[in-house]
Amino acid sequence: MKKSLFAGATLTALFSGHALANEPLTLVLDWYINPDHAPIMVAEQIGAFKAQGLDVRIVPPSDPALPPRMVAARQADLAITYQPQVHFFADEGLPLVRVGTLINSPLNTVIALDKQIKTPADLQGKKVGYSVSGIEQATLATMAQHAGIDPASIKLVNVNFQLTSALLAGQVDAVIGGYRNIEAQELKLQGKTPVVMNVEDYGVPAYDELVIVAHRDAIHEAKISKFLTALQAGVGYLRAHPQKSWEAFAAAHPELRTELNHQAWLQTVPLFATDPAALDKARYETYEQFLYNNKLVKKVTPLTNYAVQLH
């Protein structure tokens, strides 16, 4: 009798434990952990993922090009990427769909240290450093046209992701591709007074800098929607407690406790999407047309093929 009771209790415990186990979800970041990922880190800090019944594994990539392709291959549930890349993936026919937004404004800027450069019109005859061909060239050309100058009058110099150092060394007069919350802050901490031109202020359609993609066949899985709910809780807590959440983040990642990361954390707080699930359809369609007009995609892909709003 006792043996039967013990066996029954053991089975009950096993089944109860199984029922209470959190569902695993793998999220691959776009880059190493940094302040741009604050709501994700905060959601983890405050237990928002566990409250949704999720066991979220946050993975920095070995190669920044891999995360979306890992999702396309069903090797991860979600990946952080950039809205422009989502359009390129759709053009390639990859089964990736934007399901959420982390940062819902561009971070890209043109930055100059020369006091004579105040607007894109002042870039005529100047050297501008860049790192990513195609999209940054089209962005700069649009800004130049908006300012009434010939894009060909600007000399582009590939600085291989050394934007700040190229600017400080005087190799270029300005750079495009620096983030307003990172490179601009880095220059200020070095005692410089950078001129920062936000791309969306000069004719470039606004877009979401960082977004979350899932495999097309998985977008209606409950855990995707639960992740977004937890992420929204992370954003809310971060907004209410920016300094407290920074201290918790820095304690968990002491190697990232620098003044630059602290300033970037605080500067980025207002830029996170209040509702990560919300989709601005017109914004995506306008940016798709922008890419097509600049011959960066072969065709105009219908929005429903690459972006959804789950709740």
Residue ranges with predicted function:
Residues P24-V159, T164-A169, D173-N181, V196, ...:
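Short, glycine-/small- and polar/acidic-enriched structural segments
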Residues G17-A21:
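Sec/Tat signal peptide C-region and signal peptidase I cleavage site
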Residues E288-H311:
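C-terminal solvent-exposed extensions
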Residues M1-A7:
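Bacterial N-terminal signal peptides that target proteins for export
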Residues A7-S16:
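Bacterial N-terminal signal peptides
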Residues H220-L296:
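Secondary-structure end/capping motifs
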Residues P84-Q85, Q162-A252:
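Pocket-lining segment of extracytoplasmic ligand-binding domains
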Residues A48-A51, H146-P151, Q190-K192, A222, ...:
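Short helix-capping segments at alpha-helix termini
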